[in-house]
Amino acid sequence: ITTVMPVEFDYNQSTEQAFYFVIDANIGGVPIEEGDWIAAFKGDVCVGARQWIGSYTDIPVMGDDGEEYSMGYMLPGEYPTFKIYKISETTIYDAYPSQNIGFPQGLLAFFEIQSLDVIYDCAGVLGGHSSLDNCGACDANPDNDCDMDCMNVWGGEAFIDDCGVCSGGTS
């Protein structure tokens, strides 16, 4: 098992810390293997990482303690996101926790996460980012989501006519 951490998972230690103990971690329903990595993020900033050693692997999550090295790290009440690095595939996936647990106020805290899962999106892509919009379209582009017409119908065809009346569609 290689112990080399992916460069994307590099972080600085802070005096504000929480440890999230992960019981199970899966990619597409298959348990990850010893040697894979789990990291916590705030946006694009890695705030902690640990190599998977099995159930109850503790993922350190660092907070902003006011020092320059921890700028952009977690603040109380914020929720970390997680990523899994599958070492045999050299692939990093977004992983979703079974429950969201906010970063605490104070210097040290411990939490338990039942599972972290990399899932298939609506397009069948493992770790993909496509989702169904209100009209049932599956894609990863939030700028083309369907709109509600003047009759409050998603993707409807009703419109405000020249007289200011909602016309067409189901009106």
Which ranges hold each PLM region?
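Primarily marks secretory-pathway-exposed extracellular/lumenal segments that are disulfide-
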Residues: I1-S171
